[in-house]
Amino acid sequence: IRSHYPENRLIWIAASTHLEDEIEILDAYAVLKQRHPDLMLVIVPRHPERFQSTTQACRNKGFQTQLRSEDGLSDIDTDVFVVDTMGELLEFYASSDIAFVGGSLADIGGHNVLEAAVFSLPVLVGPNTHNFEEITQLLNDCGGSFLVHDANDIIRSMDSLIADKVVRVRMGQSAYNLVKEHKGTVQMTMMMIDTIMNQKALPVTIQQKNYPEKLKKNEVNPE
């Protein structure tokens, strides 16, 4: 997937999003896009029934928006890319630079931050994380995430991550180290990721990230 993005683009994925998440994400992106024109937003709505409304919300904001189902992966050179298909979240995580994990600005209780952490991504997450409270707190404590409450927090956090690659790498490595240190806690996540990734070899540019050893053992197809 990453090979289809323009090389100079920084990819921010907003994963498993709900309406309340997307309101803040899109407000933040409107500001960030002005400051960082090469920033691309990938949105993966949590529920299929929201694919259409999410896409319309992006277009109402004036963003050039492409859909996974309609545009495939050819020439992804857009403001927002909406993943309106199922079963591809982890591959898009693997192709991204920064992650926001949804259900955490919405009063949903959050979703699994480890799915982003395992791909060495710095994570933005909201305060409503009671479904994954312990591991989300550990991720914050180890320096692998920023806690955000609204669009303004997102803008501040993203500005710092975009401006400093060293900070991005350090946070991503901290997130990945948490995965390694809590293998018992993440066993089910690892099994799921291993199963999905074994279905499709990772391209070289993606595999160069820090992945668990079981993912590194997958056969690599050159791009």
Show where each model-derived region lies.
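Nucleotide-activated sugar donor-binding and catalytic core shared by glycosyltransferases
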Residues: 1-223
